[in-house]
Amino acid sequence: MNILYVPLDERPCNAIYPEQTAAVNQTMNVLSVPQALLGNKKKPANIYGIRSFIKKNIVNCSYAIISTEMLLYGGLLPSRLHHLTEADLNKYEVFLRGIKKEFPDKKIFLSNLIMRTPKYNSSDEEPDYYEQYGEAIFRYGWLKDKAARDTLDEREESEWNQLKETLPKDVIFDYETRRAFNVQVNLLHVQLVAENIVSFVSVPQDDSAPYGYTAMDQSKVYSEIANKRLKDRIMVYPGADEVGFTLLARAYNDHLGKTPSLFVRYSATFGAQIVPLYEDRPINESLKAHVLAAGFRLVDDVKDAEFVLEYNTPGKKMQESWDQLATKDVTYDSYRHLLSFVLEIQADLAVGKKVGICDAAFANGGEMELIELLDEKGILEEILSYKAWNTNCNSLGSSLAGLAFCQATFNKEKVKENLLANIYEDLFYQAIIRKQITDNVLPEKGLNYFYLGDKADEISGLVVSLIQKYHRFTLKNSFIDDVFTIDQVTFPWNRMFEICCTVKNKES
């Protein structure tokens, strides 16, 4: 089975890791766009080169998984910066219709984000004016939406009037014009699904909030989906960078003609009801959407489940991962009994269940205590998938994919490679090492979180040594045979936010 794959952007979470996760399965092959055609951060990809790649290679594939951000705009960040016209949108539509006409038996799965609205001043991933006006733009959209749907109090009314006076008109015009175009693209996809040109569309929302530009856009898209009665083929939910994982899992389950049964076990009593950082709804509501999007079905009894997703959540309040080292909220212990959770995982494994862990107790990284307990019980290497990166839904979507590919025949050594690589990056790097280096090393070298200059190789070497240190201190009963080694650690976009960390088996 071959799947053609066009990623959201060139970062490993989109262009490398989904394919690596799928590679554990020995019955499927992912044909990805060559790296040379992809862009670099704000520099757009070679859009027409990618379209040629699709036309040339789709003939040998059963499914085409395509990111609209890549195919139309040239990547995720270019989708927030573009000045495309109706003519560009028409060419995009003609291309998709032409592919379906020429290859009617191919299933096209699209992803298309609802554009985010960050609440802070930074132009790192946004237009240049976001460096000065980002927070104000967020508040402008929030108050504009709330005024239309609800009531502003006196303080909000005053702030709203002040923003209308102080925010440059050309900034608002540019921002709102781009958002309107992007919503037009979302609505085009609704029509293409209605006509069966596209089989399925995933519409993740990045950094959601109850009010604001993203909520306004979401409402327009929701309404059109409902009007055309397409909620089973176009799904809107929180997420972004996990969408490649999700659609690969959906394609594989669709190919098998299966909706695998999944039981979800939460680590905390209130875990399902917690609204995570950077998201707009309870964890359990996002879970329902991601399960359907990936092609699974939920069951209420673990005995009926082929897979068990062990969902590590906060007890009551979610913090950032680096807070666990010094300022962990007491409710992580008083509202959650982590040892009981680990013993339940051990029991699931003992009866032969296929188990994956979505570690969403903290935002932007994993929980050290969980991994230590799994290691102490000697069950860490039995886990099929461990994900704990960025947002709750990033971890959730990729966790489901990690389980989906462990159907039929799968390579257990590759599963272990991925497991260890995720522990290295999601736990050791994101939760611990990243902040240590940002606070203690970068300033003395004249560097910062967003820019590593010409010192990326030097910082990479330090990261590798620290990962190895935390491996020795943390994994006392797991991965102790020295079979696996770090293949590489690099910095996408030359910044500290994420790394590309790959692990290889020295004996293969």
PLM feature spans:
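An N-terminal assembly and electron-transfer interface module characteristic of large anaerobic redox
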Residues: M1-S508
